[in-house]
Amino acid sequence: IIGCGKIAQVRHLPEYAANPNAQVVAYHDKNRARAEEMAAQYGGVVCDSYFDLLNRDDVDAVSICVENRSHAEISTAALYAGKHVLCEKPMAVTLAECESMVAAAERNGRHLMVGHNMRFDPVHRRAKQLLDSGVIGDVITFRAVLGNAGPEGWSVDEGTWFFDKNKAALGALSDMGIHKVDLIQYLLGQKVIETTAKVVTLNKRDSEGNLIGVDDNALCI
């Protein structure tokens, strides 16, 4: 596990622990105490750097649960180290980074997966079956809405990186909206070819009272 924040704590680690075919053996987080807490709870060792973790022979695959800006860097390093990768969404912050990750996976013969977990929801899988069978007919419009209380109600850190543009790079559209962008393409079996989007930052402030630098509302057509 690289990155031991909230998504690792509530999704990745509990689900690996419940899977008899998986064993978590190593952790890295910039906050070492956080990694040590997870190791104490689930077993395994703490590594001083993600390079140390990737160099371990007993690591077959890694979950990358770090800030958006570091997804491509760490994923690519893991693939070249011969590890399979499950990277949290968004895949990366530029198209070039995404392409470099795919190239690294192909070049090293390793699996690269992005955490678009809504594809595996039983309701969505059933909808996919109905759409593919033609029972529903042609889809003319598709409307999806997703919202939550915001990173301030989610992150383990009061000063969450989600509000730091240098780390998050993007905002609500990439952190939340990406689920629906992927789901639409999965359900319909078609790729998005044209988009129009509006992203805005309302009067939202970080834990120190400063206006946040990333969008917290988005509309995409």
Predicted regions and their residues:
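Predominantly a Rossmann-like dinucleotide-binding segment in NAD(P)-dependent oxidoreductases
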Residues: M118-N210
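Beta-loop-alpha module in the N-terminal Rossmann-like domain of NAD(P)-dependent dehydrogenases
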Residues: N31, G44-A104
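N-terminal Rossmann-like dinucleotide-binding module
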Residues: I1-Y42
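Short active-site oxyanion
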Residues: A22-A26, D60-V62, G171
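Acidic-histidine catalytic/liganding microenvironments
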Residues: N19, R56-D57, D121
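Rossmann-fold dehydrogenase core element
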Residues: S100-N117, G137-F142
